[in-house]
Amino acid sequence: MKLNEIKDNEGSTHSRKRLGRGIGSGSGKTGGRGVKGQKSRSGVAINGFEGGQMPIYRRLPKRGFNNIFASDFVVVSLARIQTAIDAGKLDAKTTVDAAALKAAGVIRRVKDGVRVLADGEIKAKITIVVAGASKPAVEKIEKAGGTVTLLSAPAAAE
């Protein structure tokens, strides 16, 4: 059997039902929507409405909150940094910081800082200055002969 001889199983595909194309088609006029009412109109579905039953979003209790002071770090893996070094976009001899990562195209925006995670391997000996790094990431960088400097978070205004 060749690739061009493959066919769908019998009855597995259906042709599209053309609605509202005359009474003889069997699905003309109302097109399977019944007569009148909200569901016969366009733009029907009411999200979260369960027909008078208490909807799920009201049956379940409220939980948690959004912390407006939470730090939003941009996450970068060691693999991404190593790829940028291999491609010549990052210089391993200079200090790697948020600005250098942005200039190299590793990250798009800085937000509240950069956090390095240990996904992948790092071969280059780099000096990196970031807002955060996971313990395995720090261990991998130091094992490769590099150093990690963590920036202290700015003090909250009082």
From Swiss-Prot:
Keywords: Ribonucleoprotein, Ribosomal protein, RNA-binding, rRNA-binding. SUPFAM superfamilies: Ribosomal proteins L15p and L18e. InterPro entries: Ribosomal_uL15, Ribosomal_uL15/eL18, Ribosomal_uL15/eL18_sf, Ribosomal_uL15_bac-type, Ribosomal_uL15_CS. Transmembrane segments: none annotated. It holds the Pfam family Ribosomal_L27A. One of its GO terms (molecular function) is rRNA binding. Residues 1-45 are annotated as: Disordered. It comes from the Bacteria. GO terms for cellular component: cytosolic large ribosomal subunit. GO terms for biological process: translation. Residues 1-13 have a biased composition (Basic and acidic residues). PROSITE patterns: RIBOSOMAL_L15. Residues 21-35 have a biased composition (Gly residues). Binds to the 23S rRNA. Part of the 50S ribosomal subunit. Belongs to the universal ribosomal protein uL15 family. HAMAP family: Ribosomal_uL15. This is Large ribosomal subunit protein uL15. It comes from Rhizobium johnstonii (strain DSM 114642 / LMG 32736 / 3841) (Rhizobium leguminosarum bv. viciae). The gene is rplO.
